[in-house]
């Protein structure tokens, strides 16, 4: 039987390295380890490595093969190992893995105490550059915002809307997903719940009215809370308000430092 040609391992004559090459949007079942336990989820995964100028292509099948061997619940320790294993398997000096997934948290309604799940979008990223590893945590938290100006100028009521507050951070020690959610929800006009009864709806309506926030207030208040946490070295916080009286969003962004 004739040997099958290994085209991607052949030399390339253009003398041009590639910063990152690999796969993206791999849908894969995973377990996620968080402070509140292990969750089963379906993740969207991106896996890339640096490719030297001398090599025509990377070994695409090896990325999926590596994930097929992944059995441990994912946290930053297992992500570090997975990233290092990928770089070694692909014979590279640099590589990145990003894992995006819906994260669910059980919450109790503020008055009735009835429990329900609320979902958050989370991305864990691990990267090795020339032997040095770093990781990033990104969490999108949906909240309620109520406009201070609308409250001030109106005889009754004020416009309010859902907002998405996204925090992306690098830390020098472990920071749990739940901690970032708590930081953001504490600064919102009111947090969201999956299920509310009438007494709960009354509570969240009045709480938002008593705690109005511009989009600028939201990012400043969240940033202040993050700066106070000495584990967090750098971050970006964004807030997008899906304005109920406009057909556009209000947006604010802070990067620290």
Kindly label every feature range from the protein language model.
Residues 1-257:
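N-terminal intrinsically disordered, cationic/polar leader segments
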């Amino acid at each position: 039987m004739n040997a099958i040609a290994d085209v991607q391992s052949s030399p390339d004559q253009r003398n041009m390295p590639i910063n990152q090459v690999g796969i993206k949007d791999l849908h894969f079942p995973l377990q996620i380890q968080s402070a509140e336990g292990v969750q089963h989820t379906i993740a969207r995964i991106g896996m890339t490595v640096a490719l030297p100028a001398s090599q025509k292509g990377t070994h695409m099948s090896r990325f999926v093969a590596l994930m097929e061997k992944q059995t441990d619940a994912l946290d930053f320790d297992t992500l570090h190992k997975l990233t290092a294993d990928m770089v070694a398997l692909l014979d590279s000096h640099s590589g990145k893995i990003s894992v995006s997934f819906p994260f669910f948290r059980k919450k109790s309604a503020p008055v009735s105490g009835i429990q329900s799940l609320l979902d958050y979008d989370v991305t864990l990223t691990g990267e090795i550059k020339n032997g040095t590893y770093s990781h990033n945590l990104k969490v999108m938290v949906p909240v309620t915002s109520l406009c201070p100006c609308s409250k001030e100028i109106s005889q009754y009521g004020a416009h309010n809307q859902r907002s998405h507050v996204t925090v992306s951070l690098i830390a020098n020690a472990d920071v749990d997903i739940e901690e970032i959610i708590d930081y953001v929800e504490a600064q919102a006009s009111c947090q969201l719940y999956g299920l509310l009864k009438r007494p709960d709806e009354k509570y969240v309506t009045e709480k938002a009215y008593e705690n109005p926030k511009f989009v600028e207030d939201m990012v400043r208040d969240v940033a202040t809370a993050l700066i106070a946490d000495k584990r967090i070295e750098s971050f970006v916080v964004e807030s997008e308000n899906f304005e109920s009286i406009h057909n556009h969003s209000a947006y604010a962004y802070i990067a620290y430092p």
